[in-house]
């Protein structure tokens, strides 16, 4: 089970500084969509150049021109790139093929997908490396959790790994861990904590305890 830190609301320098503080406790560090919008793919390059020992995810949320956009993210140092599950099958397949051509991975974000089970089966067949159930900021504000979506997707796929994101914190991660996802994505639960290093360590300890059980 892998742990990912999602960084959304910092500049690239502060993102790299935070990543270096917590890198011993996480496997993947994400340059979130807001950073990409504000600073572009050089933010991915900056993280890749300045933080050792973690994989770098570029959260581009690709919708079209998928092979080109994946190739650009890879050029700037991304190990994993994201595309939206509501994109066309042709776009998903092009993104998968481009990522795999470079030995990289594709994560499909299921935000706004209505029929989770059907789409997850399709994406599994298309070769997605990760399928991520994602309760976005706006639905988190309404009190929604990704747990039920996680169960639905896990029940129907056989090849892709399952990732989960959305409001996960050190005091709620245990419920997520119990569902055995392959990747848990924590954003503000670490990044906005009073002590991000301690928050990351708490998350890692819970993940590791479950993995060893």
From Swiss-Prot:
Q: What is its EC number?
A: 4.1.2.43
Q: Which UniProt keywords apply?
A: Carbohydrate metabolism, Lyase, One-carbon metabolism
Q: Which reaction does it catalyse?
A: D-ribulose 5-phosphate + formaldehyde = D-arabino-hex-3-ulose 6-phosphate
Biological process terms from the Gene Ontology for this record are: 'de novo' pyrimidine nucleobase biosynthetic process; formaldehyde assimilation via ribulose monophosphate cycle; L-ascorbic acid catabolic process; one-carbon metabolic process
**GO terms, molecular function:** 3-dehydro-L-gulonate-6-phosphate decarboxylase activity; hexulose-6-phosphate synthase activity; orotidine-5'-phosphate decarboxylase activity
Function, as annotated: Catalyzes the condensation of ribulose 5-phosphate with formaldehyde to form 3-hexulose 6-phosphate.
Q: What is this protein called?
A: 3-hexulose-6-phosphate synthase 2
